[in-house]
Amino acid sequence: MLKRLVPSKSLVAVIDVQDRLAAAMPKEKMADVARKVGVLLEAAELLGAPVVATEQYSKGLGPTIEPIGRRLHEMGVPRFEKTAFSAVDVPEFQKRLEEVAPSAIVVAG
């Protein structure tokens, strides 16, 4: 049975929405992704859902795209650097998951 998400028991994870990865997508699609991630972040903030973000090898792939990166910063969202494909292999990310202990994770990216 499907259950309604409880914001305080959920986690929003923004995964690898970065400059060089975005450049590989059609501009109109990336603009749509950026807009939708922005709406998701606003909803998370209004509803009190915790948020985390990852960046895959930011030296090579660049930072999180604007305005998403700026919004994450304004919200005080931790960003975890990773070089492995899986975010859950990053110890800091795993620690945050354990702290929040979400019943659901909403993934964007």
Where are these regions (language model features)?
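Glycine-rich oxoanion-binding loops at beta->alpha junctions
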Residues: 79-101
